[in-house]
Design a protein with these regions (language model features):
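Intrinsically disordered, low-complexity, mixed-charge
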Residues: 1-96
Length: 96
């Protein structure tokens, strides 16, 4: 695998996405796809994540974020290219 095969994205998910297990859902998706990064709630009600790994795995994570867990209602997903995280693994962070 070359660096060209690695994608790093900042993902912001809006809608009814807090209080429904959204962060745990994304942690599970990241672990299944062997991705690095983090996820956290935002004070404005959104959920944001930094995710990095093989492009196809990142695409699968974004697809999961677009759907969300049962009980969530996603109204918008914003993607921005990003630098990869400094730590390996995927963490659930405190609200920002």
């Amino acid at each position: 695998m070359t660096n060209d095969d690695i994608t790093s994205l900042k993902v912001r998910v809006e809608g009814f996405v807090q209080g429904v297990g959204f962060r745990d859902f994304l942690v599970m998706s990241a672990q299944i796809n062997k991705l690095d990064g983090w996820v956290r709630n935002c004070a404005d009600g959104a959920v944001e994540a930094l995710v990095s790994g093989p492009t196809k795995a990142v695409e699968a994570f974004v697809a999961a974020a677009t759907q969300g867990p049962r009980g969530a209602r996603v109204t918008a997903v914003d993607l921005q290219n990003s630098e990869p995280p400094t730590e390996k693994g995927f963490q659930r962070k405190a609200t920002a």
